[in-house]
């Protein structure tokens, strides 16, 4: 591990697959929330509800919330990587639309 972050070295990973699927439609299913923890009320936090994420990205949900005293957690690094992928898709789409718009403007003179 490195200070301030987790280990991300390729040499520590197996079955690496770059995400080529379109992510943006699935990202739209995530529901950001603001909330307070019951045990630490008074401090507003931002994040997601694990049970909501479970519907779209079960692989990002940690723990066993089904057990009597179990709770769910989230792999926020995983959510971040999907968010970056979605942002990349959006940038490429905007660039394509800008190019098409400029081509139409040029045709109209």
Regions found by a protein language model. Give the residues of each.
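Small/polar residue-rich beta-strand/coil "junction" motifs that cap repeat-based extracellular fibers
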Residues: 1-18, 22
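C-terminal intramolecular chaperone/auto-processing assembly modules
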Residues: 8, 15, 59, 63-109
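Active-site-adjacent helical/loop segments in soluble small-molecule enzymes
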Residues: 53
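Short, conserved beta-strand/beta-arch hydrophobic-aromatic motifs that form part
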Residues: 45-47
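A generic structural signal for nonpolar/aromatic side chains embedded in well-ordered alpha-helices
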Residues: 16, 27-30
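Functional cleft and adjacent loop/helix regions within the main domain
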Residues: 30-40
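Stable alpha-helical elements in mature extracytoplasmic
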Residues: 23-26, 83
């Amino acid at each position: 591990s490195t200070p301030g972050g987790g280990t991300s070295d390729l040499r520590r990973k197996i079955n690496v697959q770059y995400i080529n699927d379109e992510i943006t439609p699935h990202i739209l299913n995530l529901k950001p929330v603001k909330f307070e923890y019951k045990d630490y009320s008074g401090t507003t936090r931002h994040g997601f509800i694990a049970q909501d994420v479970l519907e779209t990205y079960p692989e990002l949900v940690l723990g066993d919330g089904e057990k009597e005293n179990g709770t769910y957690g989230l792999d926020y690094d995983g959510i971040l990587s999907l968010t970056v992928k979605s942002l990349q898709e959006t940038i490429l789409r905007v660039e394509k639309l800008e190019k098409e718009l400029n081509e139409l403007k040029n045709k109209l003179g």
